[in-house]
Structure formats: C-alpha cells, structure tokens
C-alpha cells in the first residue's frame, strides 16, 4: 500500500479549516481540498462576507487522476470541466461557509435559490421537483440568523442527498438540521461556489492548487511501487497534519 498523503489546515481571515472532518450526513472522513473567502466590491472597497472550506472524500483523488493528473494548478483553475468533475464526481463533498460578517438565513438562502433557479431554467432542467426542493431549502433557513463565526454546512452525497447543518462555533459534527433529496440542488450549492460563475474565486484557486499537488504526489507514489501499472487506480488514504 502506498504511504498516506497528508493535507494541512488552512486559515481564512480569523477562521481555521481543519485538514480533515467527519461531517453530519456522512460516515467518512473528508479532506480539505481548498478554502477561500467570498466578497464583493462595495463603493470602491472589497468587503469579505464569508470564509469557505471545501472538503472531498478521499476517493476523489483516484477519480480525478484519471483525467487530470499532470495538469498544473493554473490549468485546473482555468478548466470549467475540472470543477464540474469535482462537483458531479461519485464521491462525497462537504462545504463549510463561515460568516465573517453577520447574515440572515433569509438573505443567504434567497440568493442561492435565485442563482440555482436561473441556472436550471437557462439549461432547461428546471422541473416541479426542483421547485419543491427550493421551497424546502428556503424553509430550512427562514428563521435562522448567522453572526460572525457561525457556519452553514452542506454535505453532498453522490446519491443526491443534501444534508444541511448549522453551528454557532467551529464545530462540524452533530445532527443535521435538514436533508433534502434532489441531485440538482445538491450539486448546485458547490457549483455556485467553485463552478463557472462561482462566488469564491479564492476557494476555486485553492482547490485547484491543492488537488493538483495531491494528484502529483499520488501519481509519483503509484509509479514508484514495484512497477505498478500507471493505469491502476491509487487507493491512497488521506490524513490530516
């Protein structure tokens, strides 16, 4: 067996993102694929609203390696297809959105819902099922408020389940506040952050940089194991340091 790949924690503003997590809605350990802020230019000043961490199940590494090993961080950053593979790949994802500035659940959920519906209608995939899923999504957030340091967390199952959790501190464990079964909505949350029109270019670049390095390491280790064929998938576990 190849030696484990280690991933490090990251700091975004005053908020730390652990190298690995065991989130609500999952029995697996997911590793930190990248982190960054979300902000907007307001009256000539860039204002940061949230710090975002993106975690992936370790099976993401061999899956992504099939197409993306050997690519540079810049090549991955510039590739819409790479981020689509991250969003839609057959492995779990976990996204933690931590408030830098206060935000109400209504403000957050309405913006996410608006972007999702516009995208689905634009590509012709909006149905009654998506409409019902959006209503459930809005209901979950309706009475919530998120002060600085509070987090919204999403666990995305490849089966199409979206587990939503809230925390007032840096905890990522505990019980789920809601589970919504809709594959398009499940994928849309992460897509809205690191996809083609993602709201966090910083998180997007971070994911590209860290995944490129993990693919590089896994490929080098795979090739060095007693003539192991290049096409054989790696089963390298990911641990935190």
Curated annotation (Swiss-Prot):
What are the site positions for Important for catalytic activity?
108
Q: Which SUPFAM superfamilies match?
A: Chalcone isomerase (SSF54626)
Q: In which pathway does it act?
A: Secondary metabolite biosynthesis; flavonoid biosynthesis
What protein is this chain from?
Chalcone--flavanone isomerase A
Q: What tissue expression does the UniProt record report for this protein?
A: Flowers.
| Enzyme class, first EC level, given as a word | isomerase
Q: Which Pfam families match?
A: Chalcone
Question: What is the documented function of this protein?
Answer: Catalyzes the intramolecular cyclization of bicyclic chalcones into tricyclic (S)-flavanones. Responsible for the isomerization of 4,2',4',6'-tetrahydroxychalcone (also termed chalcone) into naringenin.
Q: Which positions in this protein are listed as binding substrate?
A: 50, 115, 192
Cite the InterPro entries for this sequence: CFI, Chalcone_isomerase, Chalcone_isomerase_3-sand, Chalcone_isomerase_bundle_sf, Chalcone_isomerase_sf
Species this protein is from: Petunia hybrida
Reactions the enzyme catalyzes: a chalcone = a flavanone
Other remarks on this protein: Part of the biosynthetic pathway for all classes of flavonoids, a large class of secondary plant metabolites, many of which are brightly colored.
What family, per the record? Belongs to the chalcone isomerase family.
| Entry's Gene Ontology molecular function annotations | chalcone isomerase activity
An example GO BP is: flavonoid biosynthetic process
Organism phylogeny:
Eukaryota, Viridiplantae, Streptophyta, Embryophyta, Tracheophyta
Could you say which EC number(s) this protein's record lists?
5.5.1.6
């Amino acid at each position: 067996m190849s030696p484990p790949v280690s991933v490090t924690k990251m700091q975004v503003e005053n908020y730390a993102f652990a190298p690995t997590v065991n989130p609500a809605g999952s029995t697996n350990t997911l590793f930190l694929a990248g982190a960054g802020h979300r902000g907007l230019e307001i009256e000539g000043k860039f204002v940061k609203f949230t710090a975002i961490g993106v975690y992936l199940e370790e099976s993401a590494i061999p899956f992504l390696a099939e197409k993306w090993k050997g690519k540079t961080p810049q090549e991955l950053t510039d590739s819409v297809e790479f981020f689509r593979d991250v969003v839609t790949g057959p492995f779990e994802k976990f996204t933690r959105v931590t408030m830098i500035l206060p935000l109400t659940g209504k403000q957050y959920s309405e913006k996410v819902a608006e972007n999702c519906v516009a995208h689905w209608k634009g590509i012709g995939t909006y149905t009654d099922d998506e409409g019902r899923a959006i209503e459930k999504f809005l209901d979950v957030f309706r009475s919530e408020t998120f002060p600085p340091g509070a987090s919204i967390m999403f666990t995305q199952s490849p089966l199409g389940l979206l587990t939503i959790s809230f925390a007032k501190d840096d905890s990522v464990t505990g019980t789920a506040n809601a589970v919504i079964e809709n594959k398009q909505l499940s994928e849309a949350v992460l897509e809205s952050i690191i996809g083609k029109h993602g709201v966090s270019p910083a998180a997007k670049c971070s994911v590209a940089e860290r995944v490129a390095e993990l693919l590089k390491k896994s490929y080098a280790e795979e090739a060095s194991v007693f003539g192991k064929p290049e096409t054989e998938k790696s089963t390298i576990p990911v641990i935190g340091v």
